[in-house]
Amino acid sequence: MAKFDILEDLKWRGAINQETDEEGLRKYLAEHDDLALYCGTDPTGDSLHIGHLIPFMILKRFQMAGYHPVILIGGGTGAIGDPSGRKTERTLQTAEQVKHNEEKLTAQMKKLFGTENFEIRNNAEWLGKMNLLDFLRDYGKFFQVNNMINKDVVASRLENGISFTEFSYQILQAIDFYHLNKDNGVQMQIGGSDQWGNITAGIDLIHKLDGSDRPAFGLTIPLMLKADGTKFGKSAGGAVWLDPEKTSPYEFYQFWINQDDRDVVKYLKYFTFLSREEIEDLAEKTEKEPWKRAAQKRLAEEVTKFVHGEEGLKEAQIITEALFSGNVKSLSVPQIEQALKNAPSAEATHEAKNIVEFLVETKIEPSKRQAREDVKNGAIYVNGERQDDIDFIIEPDSDFDGKYVIIRKGKRKYTLVKIK
């Protein structure tokens, strides 16, 4: 049986930007089954976001092909900060912040990769034990300052200034690759396109210290841009997090289901494990019947299931269907809070009140005249039910444990009224 050509699959999926030695890597893969590869992430926050999925999807594909992925948490480098892609110096974190973030990220990674044939390392294990003289004697002499200055990540910062702390980051990242290569048999590093200089610095260090025939490879991923030219990864509300407390499964699902027709096939290739045949079929459906949004629905299902599991996907679909159909009464209080987290909100008391007065007092309607007109025209829904009687009394304690009243005006304009 022919061996699965993972590099060819990655190329088809548009997942490769640059490779340091494709011929050497192909030869290694043909002759060995033990490739180990890693990517690093510094614990600058307490949650991963969908930008992290870009390199992690590559690791996951290698894992599914039988290879050994390693994620390196930068407990050491995270205390300094990677200058890549930044115009200004990072604010340094306390040791307590770094430790807290490490624990949160580790839990999220284990959820994505499981515990079989997967490893999480922390560069504080070796960088934290290194003193300044060891750093200068054992590694510093292998780095030429003129070469370091010419690296894109440094050159772009020279005009406004870069501290020695951030300037030395590429040496520390090179030491990481050398350490993992020598002590853990990790042969390849992957990263974003802005990491090319750091990755090649690591390969150079490995070859200088352990010989040019030592297997060491690098692969970078293209910058993910949307069809409109903007950077992928943000929603209208900001970053899309993997932590369900920061971005609920419903919001996460909505981010993917709302992708542009021009982007959806690219994202299916990159962020799902669907076969080429399935993706080509969905591409054809998008071209012929774009209004059905079959590709977007499948994309949202696959990525939500990968990140939040079957339960998170089911929750997101239940909320989506309830909001689309208007049957919000079927939702639980936590589901309501997920669904309408970013909707306009208002406050009211527990007192029963005439619908017209309620709409004006909560500022959903600008005047009693407008409120009466909208109610008579059937444009107002209370807790999912149309109310066209201007004498209708809203009883705030009747639904949702007396915590909320949900007003819908027209087809999709929801307001979450919190009962105090």
UniProtKB/Swiss-Prot annotation:
ATP binds at K234. PROSITE patterns: AA_TRNA_LIGASE_I, S4. Its main location: cytoplasm. Keywords: Aminoacyl-tRNA synthetase, ATP-binding, Cytoplasm, Ligase, Nucleotide-binding, Protein biosynthesis, RNA-binding. One of its GO terms (cellular component) is cytosol. Its EC number is 6.1.1.1. L-tyrosine binds at Y38, Y169, Q173. It is an enzyme of class 6 (ligase). A motif ('KMSKS' region) lies at residues 231-235. GO terms for biological process: tyrosyl-tRNA aminoacylation. The keyword Transmembrane does not apply. InterPro entries: aa-tRNA-synth_I_CS, aa-tRNA-synth_Ic, Rossmann-like_a/b/a_fold, S4_RNA-bd, S4_RNA-bd_sf, SYY-like_C, Tyr-tRNA-ligase, Tyr-tRNA-ligase_bac-type. It catalyses: tRNA(Tyr) + L-tyrosine + ATP = L-tyrosyl-tRNA(Tyr) + AMP + diphosphate + H(+). A motif ('HIGH' region) lies at residues 43-52. GO terms for molecular function: ATP binding; RNA binding; tyrosine-tRNA ligase activity. SMART domains: S4 (SM00363). It is found in: Cytoplasm. SUPFAM superfamilies: Alpha-L RNA-binding motif, Nucleotidylyl transferase. Belongs to the class-I aminoacyl-tRNA synthetase family. TyrS type 1 subfamily. Homodimer. Catalyzes the attachment of tyrosine to tRNA(Tyr) in a two-step reaction: tyrosine is first activated by ATP to form Tyr-AMP and then transferred to the acceptor end of tRNA(Tyr). This is Tyrosine--tRNA ligase. It comes from Lactobacillus johnsonii (strain CNCM I-12250 / La1 / NCC 533). The lineage of its organism: Bacteria, Bacillati, Bacillota, Bacilli, Lactobacillales.
